[in-house]
Amino acid sequence: MSSTLREASKDTLQAKDKTYHYYSLPLAAKSLGDITRLPKSLKVLLENLLRWQDGNSVTEEDIHALAGWLKNAHADREIAYRPARVLMQDFTGVPAVVDLAAMREAVKRLGGDTAKVNPLSPVDLVIDHSVTVDRFGDDEAFEENVRLEMERNHERYVFLKWGKQAFSRFSVVPPGTGICHQVNLEYLGKAVWSELQDGEWIAYPDTLVGTDSHTTMINGLGVLGWGVGGIEAEAAMLGQPVSMLIPDVVGFKLTGKLREGITATDLVLTVTQMLRKHGVVGKFVEFYGDGLDSLPLADRATIANMSPEYGATCGFFPIDAVTLDYMRLSGRSEDQVELVEKYAKAQGMWRNPGDEPIFTSTLELDMNDVEASLAGPKRPQDRVALPDVPKAFAASNELEVNATHKDRQPVDYVMNGHQYQLPDGAVVIAAITSCTNTSNPSVLMAAGLLAKKAVTLGLKRQPWVKASLAPGSKVVSDYLAKAKLTPYLDELGFNLVGYGCTTCIGNSGPLPDPIETAIKKSDLTVGAVLSGNRNFEGRIHPLVKTNWLASPPLVVAYALAGNMNINLASEPIGHDRKGDPVYLKDIWPSAQEIARAVEQVSTEMFRKEYAEVFEGTAEWKGINVTRSDTYGWQEDSTYIRLSPFFDEMQATPAPVEDIHGARILAMLGDSVTTDHISPAGSIKPDSPAGRYLQGRGVERKDFNSYGSRRGNHEVMMRGTFANIRIRNEMVPGVEGGMTRHLPDSDVVSIYDAAMRYKQEQTPLAVIAGKEYGSGSSRDWAAKGPRLLGIRVVIAESFERIHRSNLIGMGILPLEFPQGVTRKTLGLTGEEKIDIGDLQNLQPGATVPVTLTRADGSQEVVPCRCRIDTATELTYYQNDGILHYVIRNMLK
């Protein structure tokens, strides 16, 4: 009997006197042909298929198809990918654990074994999304924000602690430790994984999926990983492979070096703009070129982090000497570092100088051409050169709904006994935040050095600026303190407020009352400047209409200037004690100064801070839970509720019903984000979710955020399409989650309309433009629509994760034909929609959509089914991916 490719490729290597078995790509190449120039990222996928070859989910044909990608730099084949582990954060992790607990209830009800609902691969959940910047600008901010976080989220944390003991291979990193992607980069990521199987040590690439779109950051370490929706991650941890098409790979060649005064943030904003323009949705991006020789790993991680912003599945940096240097610096063992080097070289995954893999397409950037930049005011791909920021701000201001920019005069306000004037264009939030940049010592040290020079000259933060520092790990605090820069940041109001995502995800906290009142009084257009990765409308703060991504030193600079209308490249940032003008160039640190400061970062800092990473504070340790396999649901809970998704589920799926007489619930434009669909930030008292909470006895001060209440479907379905900046074209001139209920045309909230349609047994549809579902990976942007009764979303194009999430919740994604849009069709939202023959649906097929207009006339539009693979079709036919997983467990 002939051996399989898997068996024939098994080999051994030695690292630190230890023998490891592995599945050798060079040995497999004897059957597959020359794969030397296969992109390194695809070599990781190839090893995955080789190792998991079973003749069923992974066949020899699958392996040959991936190796054969080289012929056309493209392959039309579905493959089953099994990541080594799963990463979660608490906003997506809580609903995932709710789903797992609900799945146990469903399996129990249907007569199955609840023990089968258990992760088969390691899962790390890092609590980082819950801390809010309530207090800022003083030495007590950190302790107060931590206290409030524990107070508000106690029930959620009890639930996560229950999950930790109820599920195997499930670890929780407690609050106040850091941001999941930075913890992953600095500690959890291994680059090469090893485990004992049948008495042999097996080595294989570290790979993962995560329930956060910025999971891609780990690609900077040479670890292949990307974000998926919570439902897909749950399926993966329960042993279900990730179904995917073999991706195209775009090569991005980096040459040269960054000039003096240019940061990694400027570089990533440039890369993001270039790749968004090139078009990389659903594709891998792999970086190569001699520019990588001098590109620090922290800079690579910054670029990899923003893969969702440029639209790629991942932005991959192959393993090389820079990778090993970072692993040593961050405290990985020498045994692990040697294994990574020997494995990567043995497998052809090591980056050598001059490597030129074959790519589907390529771009090139000479880093010497990168200029100081921000991105804004509403999209991360909209890069603006520093001198052009005032012009970009003015242009966005003119476009605001109901804008009366020319009439907006500065507003007088009193704070702390002093009178000030708040101008239009004021910077009201300046936040050093987000793993994108706080994982990078060079830009953090640059911010501290700029603060030192500013304080020395007597510059002060403008009084209306809410400043904050929220690093992604405690190591940052250690090295800023070692470099003696913390006092200067504190002096300018950049006191430590927490170790978590904070402002970047919308947890910026309230502005001081006088500031909020002044903004509302004259409808001022104000700005937030943050070192984050997202700046979508309504995300950072409900009253802040323009949000700008910038490097940490520029964040400090804008806190000093206090106004988006100032040209920091040519106008004074302030005045020194003598009254002389001070320019940005006067306080910008030199490359040498930054390099000297970065030398303070040491291996001991990483080892000290990660020695007890799973332990937590005394408050966390004090949370006691009762051991049990199933959760004790509390009927009066407003945080954790048994989700209804499996309530009516049977052991055998019913045939998919055709869609008859569907009404359009919302008609939306381009770049509608998952923030628009399912906001993460504050809950308005007069919103459907706010009214629900008040009806359950929750006071306004205890609302917390939508993100923190994702374990309660009642809140989340009411929060669907509730973003205050969403614009439904069915109600022109109105911002917020409103629509028209038809045929009576009553203008009501989207939630209220959906509930009326549900009573009338009317299925629902959403119509949209390009890039529907861009942004965060949040599965509630698919779960919420499902609970509202939405059966189909018809858009010009979809972002990758959201398309997958819709299918995972049993919602049909359809794409208009090329050149056809809601506008060319003249849609008003009053049309009815019919879609038939859904039982015979096929991946990628043309689906006739019948539109019946208000006057009774009809038009058939041939849309493209965006169920892309046979596996996805199976999920859809089962009413969702988790239903499919449960039914498999019952067999």
UniProtKB/Swiss-Prot annotation:
PROSITE patterns: ACONITASE_1, ACONITASE_2. One of its GO terms (biological process) is anaerobic respiration. [4Fe-4S] cluster binds at residues 435, 501, 504. Optimum pH is 7.4. It retains a high specific activity over a broad pH range. It catalyses: citrate = D-threo-isocitrate. The keyword 4Fe-4S applies. It is an enzyme of class 4 (lyase). Disruption phenotype: Cells lacking this gene are more sensitive to peroxide stress. The acnAB double mutant does not grow on unsupplemented glucose minimal medium and does not respond under aerobic conditions to glutamate. The acnAB double mutant retains a low but significant aconitase activity. Pathway: Carbohydrate metabolism; tricarboxylic acid cycle; isocitrate from oxaloacetate: step 2/2. Transmembrane segments: none annotated. Its cofactor is [4Fe-4S] cluster. The keyword Iron-sulfur applies. Its EC number is 4.2.1.3. One of its GO terms (cellular component) is cytosol. One of its GO terms (molecular function) is mRNA binding. Binds 1 [4Fe-4S] cluster per subunit. Keywords: 4Fe-4S, Iron, Iron-sulfur, Lyase, Metal-binding, RNA-binding, Tricarboxylic acid cycle. Induction: Induced upon entry into stationary phase by iron, oxidative and salt stress under aerobic conditions. AcnA is subject to CRP-mediated catabolite repression and ArcA-mediated anaerobic repression. AcnA is negatively regulated by ryhB RNA. The AcnA activity over a broad pH range might be a useful adaptation for specifically expression in the stationary phase, where the intracellular pH may vary over a wider range. AcnA is resistant to oxidation in vivo. NCBIfam families: aconitase_1, PRK09277.1, PRK12881.1. Belongs to the aconitase/IPM isomerase family. Catalyzes the reversible isomerization of citrate to isocitrate via cis-aconitate. The apo form of AcnA functions as a RNA-binding regulatory protein which plays a role as a maintenance or survival enzyme during nutritional or oxidative stress. During oxidative stress inactive AcnA apo-enzyme without iron sulfur clusters binds the acnA mRNA 3' UTRs (untranslated regions), stabilizes acnA mRNA and increases AcnA synthesis, thus mediating a post-transcriptional positive autoregulatory switch. AcnA also enhances the stability of the sodA transcript. Monomer. This is Aconitate hydratase A. It comes from Escherichia coli (strain K12). The gene is acnA.
